[in-house]
Amino acid sequence: MTKEKTINLSFGRTICKASINDLSIVMELIEQGKAKMIKAGNPNQWSASYPAESTIKCDIAQGDCYLLYECGKPIATFVAKAGPEPNYHRIYKGDWLDDQPYYVIHRVASVEGVHGVMADIIKYCSTLTSSIRIDTHADNRPMQASLTRLGFVYCGVIYVENGDSRLAFQCVF
């Protein structure tokens, strides 16, 4: 666990940047996240090969990959980085809330049975920016519910590299 930029949260939770030494932990969390998505009726958001280990290595190298720990145990991973996000240049069936600088959150994955992960991620990201954008699959109902509960506004539809559509959300603090 990298000690720099550690953010203390409630319930013995901390968030810190992942290092290359954490790669296997991040990949295991992603596999658990995939299983959770399938179980929740969202089998199509992440494929067997996405996110690839090479993508995660790049996220880590750029300093954008994070781990959420509870009492010293890794329970979630995510990517948070400053925009612009190329897939967000065009939005359909709506508009972004503003044109100000923002952070984007990607690749959120957590172990089964933990709650409040998105709230902790948003709390951390709100220390970095006053605007967050995120997208999710139409079948990812748990994520959509979390985002709405946390004050995100549905803004429209974006398309990712492979042409699949995603629901786009934004929160301005």
Task: Report residues per predicted region.
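A short beta-loop-alpha structural element at the N-terminal edge
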Residues: R13-E28
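Conserved acyl-donor/pantetheine-binding loop and adjacent beta-alpha core of acyl/acetyltransferases
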Residues: V79-G113
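Conserved acetyl-CoA-binding loop-helix of GNAT-fold acetyltransferases
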Residues: S110-T127, A145-R149
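Conserved GNAT acetyl-CoA-binding A-motif
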Residues: T127-D139
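Conserved catalytic-core motifs of GNAT/GCN5-like acyltransferases
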Residues: D135, V153-L167
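Conserved active-site alpha-helix within GNAT-family acetyltransferase domains
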Residues: D139-G156
